[in-house]
Amino acid sequence: MPEMAKPAEGGKRYSLNYAAMYRLTNWDTVKVYTATTVAPTDYNREGTGDRFGGNAELQDTIATYQITNDKAFKIAIDRGNFEQGMRAKKAGEVMRYEMNEQIIPMIDKDRLATVAAGATAVSQAVSMTTDAYQDTLKLNEYLDECKAPLDGRVLWVTPAEYNKVKTAITTNILASGYNDKLVGKGFVGELDGVPVVKVPTSYFPTGIVALMTHRDALLGVRQVTETRIITDSEFVSGSILLGRFIFGSFILKGKEKAVASIVDGSAISS
């Protein structure tokens, strides 16, 4: 029995599902709760009352975000076409191809676009130079200054930018110390302790060649993830594949500076 040619799939490799403490309120609104901390005071050894300086009740900072992405698809597989095509177009396989080729990349692109916009909003977009390695170090510097933990940082790069960074390192006198870290670490490597994820250029907004963020800074919400295969429709003799996805991605309040980007200005101007 012939098989349907498989489309290129890659979405699962880049899926970004970061979470935080949040609650869905209205159908299109999500509230994120963050506990606030207090500054230490001097302990009063001579005090006759509360030597700790009084009680400060724990307060929650509440940030509200609106979910705007509401996407859907519908695919019909006519029974006649299915039989005459020697049953190559199996509904389950088509659904999997749709998810891997269209839906997962769509959501990943939205996440990356959110990070890119966030970096621009806080003026942490590095202009690309001829020294790709130094450009990448600047991203780490931004996250260092905002006290983002090293554990949890992720660097996404285009294939071309990855090659530039790798070339800069492997031709450096420190190459032997880095070569082993650029392979076999999961992802495609590790750079200064940060996992590196190589992503197709088409996933990035125009001009963006690299993005770095801490996982705690990016909130990815999937309110509705629905897929169905209908085999008893009165309108189609065959199968109907349906899908609906309501999702959103946000840079969390208080963590806005835990994102940075490298921008190729020539690509934007052209």
Q: What are these language model-derived features?
A:
Residues M1-L24, R215, R222-S270:
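Protruding loop/beta-arch "assembly-hinge" segments enriched in small, turn-prone residues
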Residues M1-Y65, V224, A267:
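N-terminal "assembly arms/tails" that initiate or stabilize quaternary assembly
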Residues P40-Y43, K164-T167, F250-I251:
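Short helix/loop capping segments that flank catalytic or ligand/cofactor-binding pockets
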Residues G54-V94:
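Long, hydrophobic/aromatic-enriched structural stretches that serve as scaffold segments
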Residues R79-A148, V259-S270:
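Alpha-helical scaffold segments that mediate packing/assembly in large oligomeric complexes
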Residues A117-F187:
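Extended, solvent-exposed, turn-rich assembly/linker loops in the middle of proteins
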Residues K185-F235:
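Glycine/small-residue-rich hydrophobic helix-like segments
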